[in-house]
Amino acid sequence: MEREDIIKFIAAHKAKFEQEFGLKRIGLFGSYARGEMREESDIDIVVEIEKPDLFHLIGIKQAIEEVLGTKVDIVRLRDTMNQTLRSRIERDVIYV
């Protein structure tokens, strides 16, 4: 799996995610975004959604995992999150 494959998938499904889950913004961060992925790496996704809902996060996560066949970690970007994690995300993120 290459970074470009993930970005293409997200771009192709972004409108669906916006409509179905209230997605405002989505991006790739972590090892795939940095080009440092290994065979055992998971896909790290950051999202901003209109009305935060656990089921929406799970829906986005499952949609990506089912097609790409790789474990996905999904993080909702918010003002009150751990600032160290937020800084790491903002350093690496590639918004689609």
What spans do the regions from the language model cover?
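P-loop (Walker A) phosphate-binding loop of NTP-binding proteins
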Residues: 31
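Short beta-strand->loop micro-motif that forms the acidic, two-metal-ion catalytic signature
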Residues: 44-47
